[in-house]
């Protein structure tokens, strides 16, 4: 998921949530030309294995022989400490283990991503991550027995006792949201234009919300519009739309929920 703030062509802030193996093709298709931060939900391959392709946005310096006279070409390093990568301890451990070369001394000829990993456990509603004008609060969740992180992104947030703000919650790969996290989401629910929530399929699953479970949680949070993500292929997009429409018709309250899709653009 790519979040931007400001001009769509030259965004003031550019944030990525997760970086799957097809990140490069998605970045080219969406014309992503800079990043300010990467937020990780967890370290499973479909959410992390495109990490090496982030080097175009933040990279170490390198040198390589060129020509026949033993000349060496120098490639300058990106300024600063490196692109910040936020995640819980599990996700960051996966980063350091599976991409260990990133954190080792630069080898001759080898440019690589320049990253700064940051444990998100130190951030909260009282102490959000601030990137540009966007405030970001980590939301602890469970994906089976694995602790994952959802992300609450807010514009105009002034802290606890907040006044009007608006935002989006991104809650993928979960089958349980702890009570404290759910209470946090409920507090911000009236200010959320969008909720993107895990909903794998109609049948129950051991590590993902089903459609009905996702609807139940989405109703409790109360965002203006909810979207199901991480969908499997048991049903087509249209079939899921019809299923949700039938479920929503049984509710007495005004509630909107649709299946998400590749290339979906949401505005807050």
Q: Which residues fall in each region the model found?
A:
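Binuclear metal-dependent hydrolase catalytic cores
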Residues: 1-171, 175-183, 237-268
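Binuclear metal-ion centers of metallo-dependent hydrolases, dominated by the metallo-beta-lactamase
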Residues: 178-268
């Amino acid at each position: 998921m790519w979040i931007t703030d400001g001009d769509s062509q030259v965004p003031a802030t550019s944030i990525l949530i997760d970086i799957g193996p097809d990140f490069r093709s998605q970045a080219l298709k969406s014309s992503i030309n800079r990043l300010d931060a990467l937020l990780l939900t967890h370290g499973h391959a479909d959410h992390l294995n495109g990490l090496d392709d982030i080097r175009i946005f933040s990279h170490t310096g390198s040198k390589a022989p060129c020509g026949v006279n033993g000349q060496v070409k120098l490639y300058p390093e990106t300024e600063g400490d490196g692109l910040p990568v936020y995640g819980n301890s599990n996700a960051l451990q996966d980063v350091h283990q599976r991409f260990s070369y990133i954190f080792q001394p630069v080898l001759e000829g080898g440019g690589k991503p320049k990253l700064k990993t940051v444990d998100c456990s130190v951030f909260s509603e009282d102490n959000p991550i601030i990137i540009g004008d966007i405030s970001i609060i980590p939301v602890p969740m469970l994906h089976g027995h694995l602790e994952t992180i959802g992300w609450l992104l807010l514009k105009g947030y002034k802290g606890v006792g907040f006044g009007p703000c608006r935002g989006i919650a991104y809650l993928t790969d979960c089958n349980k949201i702890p009570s404290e996290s759910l209470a946090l989401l409920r507090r911000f629910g009236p200010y959320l234009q969008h909720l993107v929530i895990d909903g794998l399929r109609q049948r129950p699953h051991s590590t993902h919300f089903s459609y009905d479970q996702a609807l139940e949680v989405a109703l409790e949070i109360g965002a203006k519009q909810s979207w199901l993500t991480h969908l499997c292929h048991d049903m087509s997009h249209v079939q899921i739309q019809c299923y949700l429409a039938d479920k929503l018709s049984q509710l007495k309250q005004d509630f909107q929920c649709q299946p998400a899709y590749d290339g979906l653009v949401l505005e807050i």
